[in-house]
């Protein structure tokens, strides 16, 4: 079950991506989602299959969402994930003495 997918990034939120079937373009994405997402910026096209690994998403969930609803929305990582990667010095900077 291979799918050719177009991936768009959101101009409103860093690291938010919208996966759609290339043949459908954005036709099946609800208008309300497009308003919240912002004007989609094409990032790249990708062939998806169950054997392919994605860095932050479960490939089976992405493929299921593409088949059932016509799109998959990848949310940005939680802000806590960003904080964990900061140096200890920055994490402690505002702590009371």
UniProtKB/Swiss-Prot annotation:
Q: Which PROSITE patterns match?
A: YCGL
Which parts of the sequence belong to the YcgL domain?
3-87
Stored Gene3D superfamilies = YcgL domain (3.10.510.20)
Q: InterPro entries from the xrefs?
A: YcgL-like_sf (IPR038068), YcgL_dom (IPR027354)
Q: Where is the signal peptide?
A: none
Cystine bridges: none
User: Which HAMAP family does the record match to this protein?
Assistant: UPF0745 (MF_01866)
- The name on file for this protein is YcgL domain-containing protein PSPPH_1548
What is the organism field in this record? Pseudomonas savastanoi pv. phaseolicola (strain 1448A / Race 6) (Pseudomonas syringae pv. phaseolicola (strain 1448A / Race 6))
């Amino acid at each position: 079950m291979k799918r050719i997918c177009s991936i768009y990034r959101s101009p409103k939120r860093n690291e938010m991506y919208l996966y759609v079937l290339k043949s459908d373009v954005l036709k099946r994405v609800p208008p309300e989602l497009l308003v919240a997402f912002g004007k989609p910026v094409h990032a790249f096209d990708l062939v998806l299959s169950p054997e392919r690994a994605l860095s932050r998403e479960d490939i089976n969930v992405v493929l299921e969402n593409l088949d059932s609803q016509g799109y998959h929305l990848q949310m940005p990582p939680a802000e806590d994930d960003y904080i964990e990667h900061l140096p200890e010095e920055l994490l402690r900077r505002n702590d009371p003495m």
